[in-house]
Structures are given as C-alpha cells and as structure tokens.
C-alpha cells in the first residue's frame, strides 16, 4: 500500500514539474520572441526614420505588388535621355499601369526582366551556376548574351521620376554592359536587367513590383514651404524630378500655369560625366526657368580634372562650397537628400560633421538612398 502511495505521489510530482518546465519554457520562448520583436521593430523604426514615414497612405502602397504577384503593365514610350557625346546609355521608360500602381514621390518600382521567358521557353536549360541558357538561340537580335538570365525571379529597383498624379509611371534606367573576353570577342554582355531594357519596345509587356522605399518628401513640405538640398549623381536625379513635379504641381498639359502654393528654396547639386550626360535636362531647365527664385542648380562634370589629374566629383564641388552648403543646411533648415553613388554619402556626411552643432536633431533632416 505504501509502495503504491509513493509511486502515485512520485508520478504527480513529476507531472507538476514537467508542466512547470513546459510553462517556463513557453514563457521563456515568448520573452525571447518578444525581445526579438522589439529589437527588429526598433531597428526597423530607426531605418525607416518615422519622422517622414508615418503617412498611412504611403504604408498602404509599400509592396502592394511582389515578385510572386507582380503587376503586368505596358510600355507606352521609350526615350534616350543622353546626347551623342555621353559615354553612357540611359533610357526613360513611360509605363501604363491603368491606375493600379500606387506610389508616392520618391518611391522605387521593381522591374522583373524576362518574366515570361523564365516559364514559357521550353528550350531553357539550367546550368550548374543556376543560370538559364537558351540552347537554340544563345544571343538575341541585338547580340545580347542570355547566359546571365537568372533562374530565380528577382526584380531590379529603379527610382520613379513621375509624380503620382500623372497617368503613367516613368523611370530612368542606365544600361550596364561589358565586353566578352577572348572566348567570344564579338559578344557584349549586359547587366541582369539592362539587356532586357535595351530590347524593350513600345507596347511590350513589363512586370512591376512595389512600391518600395521610404525616400519621400515630408508630408507637410508644401504647407510649411520646406527648404531642400538635393544631391545626385547619374540616375539619382530621378526622385528629385518626381519631387519637383509634386512641389510645383507640374501639369504637362498646362506647362505655364503656376498652380502650386509652394514658395520654398531648393538647391540641387548634380554630378554627371559631361554636359551630354545630364538626365532630364528639359525638365530641369523648365523648372529653373519657371521658378528662378526657388531653384538653383549646380552641375558638376567629372570629366574635368583636378590639378593632380584626378576627377572632380559632386562631393568635391560641395566641399569647395562648404560655407554656402552649411549655411543652407544649418540656417535655412534645409531637408538634405542624397541619391546616387555611395561614395558621395561619406564626403557629405564628413562636411556636416565638421560643424560643431551637427546633432541628432539635424541628423534627422538627412535622407540617403545610395547604391
């Protein structure tokens, strides 16, 4: 009898201990998960800079379309944005999305190249490097190698240059290319999306993801007449074209009507290789002509060299105008935007930090999107 009692008691105690351990384990797991959530959430908040990102409308636009569920659109126009003496090849694409692609100025869209080819070409074979090779037609009509089309679908992101009140969406895309080595000297290879973009024609289908990013204007920029400094290299000018169209209520059907109440001051530092490489030149000249008291543009050409034969870049121009630049940022309370090659970020931040009063409050006025 005693043995049976001891056995039952031991079973009960072990059960309680087991339950206690399970409860403790579940509590610990919840605490760990909660801590992880807080860490990620806090990091996410810091990355997003919620000063500008608390717009509910904007949050509804983010990732509305994904790689698994993209939006099928049509190319309605394709324009070469550079002139003959530019070493680059850059296209402006105008895309009809039937009003379905929602975005704010400063957002990016993703383009999925070869969307149909990845599924519908029976001659595609996968090699060991997980690239797709077309066994019947290794190059397309423009002699562009297809060996770099990736098996796994992914999108390349491009800044939107149109305003969200316009019928069509537009982007500027630089074509990246490089020559094949001695094995195939007559073949030019293109970047993952570049070959696809180069071959696009009007009325072709194109698949978009997005909208993406948080490189946007303050919600109250027009009401408060916020001053701005825009720094760009190459295609980094695209979001600023979008910003200008928003701030000045641009209407391509009524170009000479001033419909905006915005009276702030905008300084643009734009670095490109030479004069023929300026993107959206017509738009920039239009805004400067229409609003001469509101816009000042500094073009910086890298083909011009310093005395030591090194190239002169946009960050060098800003350093040369350091006093003027810091005066705009500190005394005119400008919101500073940096978009383009990642090298410009460090030099500009060094200039800002050289001022004794560059604190966390001012840091919140700096917005960066580099590549």
Curated annotation (Swiss-Prot):
Q: Which residues form the FAD-binding FR-type domain?
A: 68-218
Q: What is its EC number?
A: 1.18.1.2
Query: Which residues participate in FAD binding?
Result: 68, 155-159, 172-179, 192-194, 235, 342, 371
Q: Which residues bind NADP(+)?
A: 174, 272-273, 302, 313-315, 341-343
Q: Where in the cell is it found?
A: Plastid, Apicoplast
The keyword Cell membrane belongs to this UniProt entry's keyword annotation? no
Q: Which cofactor does it need?
A: FAD
Q: Which GO terms describe its molecular function?
A: electron transfer activity; FAD binding; ferredoxin-[NAD(P)H] reductase activity; ferredoxin-NADP+ reductase activity; identical protein binding
- Keywords, in A-Z order: Apicoplast, Disulfide bond, Electron transport, FAD, Flavoprotein, NADP, Nucleotide-binding, Oxidoreductase, Plastid, Transit peptide, Transport
Q: Which CDD domains match?
A: CYPOR_like_FNR
> Which effect does the record note for changing residue 341 to A/L?
Strongly decreases affinity for NADPH
Identify the domain of life: Eukaryota
Provide the reaction this enzyme catalyses. Answer: 2 reduced [2Fe-2S]-[ferredoxin] + NADP(+) + H(+) = 2 oxidized [2Fe-2S]-[ferredoxin] + NADPH
Q: Which family does it belong to?
A: Belongs to the ferredoxin--NADP reductase type 1 family.
PANTHER family linked to this entry: PTHR43314
Oligomer and partners: Monomer. Homodimer; disulfide linked. NADP binding accelerates formation of an inactive, disulfide-linked homodimer when the protein is exposed to air for 24 hours or more (in vitro); the physiological relevance of this is uncertain.
Q: Identify this protein by name.
A: Ferredoxin--NADP reductase, apicoplast
Give the classification, highest ranks: Eukaryota, Sar, Alveolata, Apicomplexa, Aconoidasida
Report the gene name.
FNR
